[in-house]
Amino acid sequence: MMKLNIKNETSRLRAVILGTAESPGPTPEYENAYDPKSAEHIKAGTYPLEEDIVKEMEAVREVLEKYDVQVFRPNLVKDLNQIFTRDIAFVIDDKFIKANILPDREEEIEAIQYVIDQIDPNKVIELPEDVHVEGGDVMLYNDHLFIGAYYGEDYPQFITARTNLNGVEHIRKMFPNKKVHSFNLRKSNTEARDNALHLDCCFQPVGKGKAILYKDGFLDEKEYEWLVNFFGKENIFEITQQEMYDMNSNVFSISEDVVISERNFTRLNTWLRENGMTVEEVPYAEIAKQEGLLRCSTLPLIRD
């Protein structure tokens, strides 16, 4: 049996499920896009090609293996986008929680069933139907849990709203020992620059007590300010709207000292290095066109 352990975003990583970019299927129809950024690229004819995204994901696999991380990959399902494993499930402490994802993504969970089979079945949690939480909205910080959500009555109208208040409450009940903080995120079905698809599109802790943050991803300025006070202004790297659009907050930590980042994130990578971190740069700009980056395409199972 695999003993899961995830308590934060930065402890030394030992095992992870990395998505796969092979056989993602034809470019989706414009009206079938799940998010505004993919739609933008479908329309412009710049939607990523399979060979490019396969190369990008291989670069990440190489970095993970260089640090002796055990890397699981989903079983290949032909013509299915299986890049973003973070959406389909997530781990809190020693629990593996399956997300209630869009129905046509069920096959993605089946493709990692061989991994789930290695986990104690009592630790594998299925959520009730009206409880929506995706891994990109769940950020762990030891005793604290940060959860991105959308509070509006019009939640069902937003294909970009992936976590609801039922989701926040359900997690709160499941983990009574954690301090759960929720954040109301800005959503747009049509304009990627005004859309925080998940919490990790506008916030992520890195290193020792530092964080990357994008102010306008939060609908309530008080919630944004709470985060600033929690980490301390001097420990925060504020990103611009363009950097948010390019997915700067969606890097992925192997440890407090090692971060995998996109090679074009010049300003962020400089800041990470100035703060004592080793930055492993990879090309990920094609995958970013689907409104997801490094954190979105990883599902950590075990950290120290």
Write out the residue ranges for each language-model feature.
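The feature marks the mature, well-folded catalytic cores of soluble enzymes
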Residues: 1-304
